[in-house]
Swiss-Prot record:
The lineage of its organism: Eukaryota, Amoebozoa, Evosea, Eumycetozoa, Dictyostelia. Belongs to the cup family. InterPro entries: Ca_Up-reg_Membrane_Reg, Ricin_B-like_lectins. Residues 40-181 form the Ricin B-type lectin domain. GO terms for molecular function: carbohydrate binding. This is Putative calcium up-regulated protein J.
Length: 655
């Protein structure tokens, strides 16, 4: 059923009646949604089309920390140090730690670029302004990002060339010119002032009507058919070449209209091809009538189809774009410009075709219904966007000018994008489904020494964890994935093979719940009355949170940093109340200005005598943020109970 709906959707949008006077449409606003991008240099090596981008030195092989240098480097698969997000003037790195682009005031006369922790104030040294000629200016120094040694004249780019913030002697120095890819030009085009098509009178109007009637019998206004998919405007352009002017119309008037329409037909045909390419990608990826979802559900072996599953359309689209940026850097920016344009329009659309970019929670049996309705809405609004462009001369010209650059979509791109997109879509489904059945368990090597328990009291690591289900971090902590009800029951190899396929998923992200993964994490020990609260920051805003106000113990407080797109949890929640029934309060704040984001009371109760489980008590959330239903998992033998609280931006509650 959905295949038929999707196949017909674009043609439904394009169809229009005869002799309809076109009315241009302009969106009053388009929702700007967060997205990762490359900062691509306009400097290229001769004979080498692989772009150079702003990168963090050695970030693909080591774990960077604040103060690490920023360098020029060609795009490198799975290097998070090459992806950035523009947030309130800051250039936020995808690397763990809430790092932003900054200037090293202590080295090279204070011009070297580094990553640094975001300063908790309005510090202009860490904010940047994008110029119209590709320049990126620092708001404090008024200098520009460039390649070291090139301020007087461009030099050949090279890997690991130091990036600086300096002045340049030429505004056209390619070593000081950059492009964000994707750059989302459709957002501004769709909101630009309407520009009508050229209007004609007298002989020119006669020529226009004559040509229209000769191309389509009974049609006096050929432009009214630009959104009609029944016609080939490339064929019309060929017909115009040999069309003779009538005696009743001057040759000059006829030739002027003919030349204008040939130009318009070329633009219409090219724009329709762009949207057809997206349609083919969209249908090729999403119109599987739930086959991919059903396959993953079957492999994970869900027994209860009433299980609640949390999901997000925005996360799916972001994963697709991130993976395309990683594996297909050449067409990625252009693809992202089209796809994110569709999402921006869809999230700003009016019902019933609005896409809800906020997280949702549904029963597993209804997950496909939620996904497919949003996929349909995206495609519908893509058609609406195409129609808006084809009805407006200004928008048509603006889009056409970009078809050879930032909106270029070559014939070979579609199959590559579908293949890479399918991998990302599968990962998104795993991110939704796995936390409903499994959680991460953490065995901390210092736990017994810290608490001074007698030998044998701390729970041992299970001896038979499959290799594909475990990872040891740089501190010696052992993390593994297992059932929420038994730490000795693990996902089957077929499930984990999907996770680790093509090395797309970074193990540290998976086991530490970062960049889209959000498992509850339980500690391996025998204090089963403990509940370990996990908080996931699914935003570009650095946060922190405190755990305190324990029943019977008002003095014990824990404070944790909560970097962007990551999860934090304490390695203990010991307090003076030794019972199984207690409560505590979690307070989440913005790390930059200390404003409160949310406050939640967690109530912990005894289960089965020696175990515990939490539930959500009184809570409040600041306008502009969302906290869905937290996951609460009961403690099991040799491990603590746990919960996971996920903080998201409420995009329906922001401008």
């Amino acid at each position: 059923m959905i295949n038929e709906i999707l196949d017909n959707k674009m043609s439904d949008i394009r169809s229009s009646g005869k002799n309809v006077k076109l009315e241009s449409t302009t969106m009053t606003s388009v929702k700007d949604l967060p997205s990762w991008c490359f900062i691509k240099s306009r400097a290229m090596l001769k004979g080498d089309n692989k772009p150079f981008v702003v990168s963090v030195l050695n970030s693909s092989t080591e774990t960077p920390s604040k103060g690490w240098k920023c360098v020029l480097f060609q795009t490198n698969i799975n290097d998070k140090g090459q992806l950035w997000q523009l947030v309130d003037g800051h250039l936020l790195s995808q690397l763990y730690g809430s790092f932003v682009l900054d200037i090293d005031s202590d080295n090279n006369n204070g011009t070297d670029l580094i990553i640094n922790s975001q300063i908790p104030s309005n510090n202009e040294r860490q904010t940047w302004k994008l110029g119209s000629n590709g320049e990126i200016m620092n708001n404090q120094t008024k200098m520009f990002i460039g390649v070291k040694g090139s301020n007087s004249a461009p030099i050949d780019p090279s890997n690991n060339a130091q990036l600086v913030c300096e002045s340049t002697t030429s505004v056209d120095n390619v070593c000081f010119q950059w492009d964000l890819e994707p750059s989302f030009p459709l957002n501004s085009i769709l909101t630009q002032t309407t520009e009508p098509f050229p209007n004609y009178t007298d002989e020119k109007l006669k020529a226009y009507i004559y040509i229209s009637n000769n191309l389509i019998k009974g049609i006096d206004d050929i432009r009214s058919q630009y959104t009609n998919s029944n016609y080939s405007f490339n064929s019309f352009s060929n017909e115009l070449v040999n069309m003779k002017y009538p005696d009743s119309i001057s040759k000059d008037s006829f030739d002027e209209i003919k030349t204008q329409l040939q130009s318009e037909f070329e633009q219409v045909d090219s724009i329709i091809n762009l949207f057809n390419n997206y349609q083919q990608f969209h249908i090729g990826l999403f119109a599987d009538n739930s086959a991919r979802l059903n396959q993953i559900v079957s492999i994970i072996q869900f027994d209860d189809k009433t299980t609640s599953v949390a999901g997000s359309i925005l996360s799916i689209i972001s994963n697709i774009l991130k993976l395309v940026l990683t594996f297909l850097p050449q067409p990625a920016g252009n693809f992202g410009n089209v796809m994110m344009g569709a999402i921006s329009v869809s999230s700003a659309a009016s019902t019933p075709n609005k896409v809800n970019v906020d997280p949702f929670k549904v029963e597993l049996s209804k997950l496909w219904d939620s996904l497919s309705s949003n996929f349909e809405a995206i495609l519908f609004n893509m058609g609406t966007m195409e129609s808006m462009i084809l009805k407006d001369w200004g928008k048509m010209k603006a889009v056409y000018q970009l078809l050879s650059t930032s909106l270029a979509w070559t014939p070979t791109m579609t199959s590559q994008l579908i293949s890479t997109g399918a991998t990302a879509y599968g990962i998104s489904l795993l991110q939704m489904l796995l936390p409903e059945k499994y959680q991460i368990y953490c065995w901390n090597q210092n736990f017994d020494a810290k608490y001074g328990f007698a030998p044998g009291y701390p729970a041992p690591i299970p001896s038979d964890i499959p290799e594909y289900c475990t990872w040891t971090d740089e501190n010696g902590d052992v993390l593994f994935i297992a059932s929420t009800s038994d730490l000795r029951v693990h996902p089957i190899k077929e499930v984990m093979d999907m996770v680790w396929k093509d090395n797309v998923v970074v193990k540290k992200d998976f086991y530490r719940s970062r960049n889209g993964w959000s498992f509850p994490t339980s500690l391996v020990n025998r204090i089963t009355r403990w509940l370990i609260p996990n908080v996931t920051n699914n935003t570009s805003i650095p946060m922190k949170y405190t755990i305190g106000d324990f029943k019977g113990d008002s003095k014990t407080t824990y404070q944790l940093d909560l970097p962007t797109f990551s999860t934090s949890y304490p390695l203990d929640v010991s307090h003076n109340n030794n019972g199984h029934n207690y409560h505590f309060t979690i307070t989440i704040t913005n790390a930059l200005d200390n404003s409160k984001i949310a406050s939640l009371v967690i109530i912990v109760s005894a289960v089965g005598g020696s175990f515990s489980k939490g539930q959500l008590g009184d809570h409040s959330v600041t306008k502009g943020y969302l906290i869905g239903d937290p996951i609460f998992n009961t403690s099991v033998r040799d491990s603590t109970s746990t919960c996971n609280i996920i903080v998201n931006i409420d995009y329906n509650d922001t401008n």
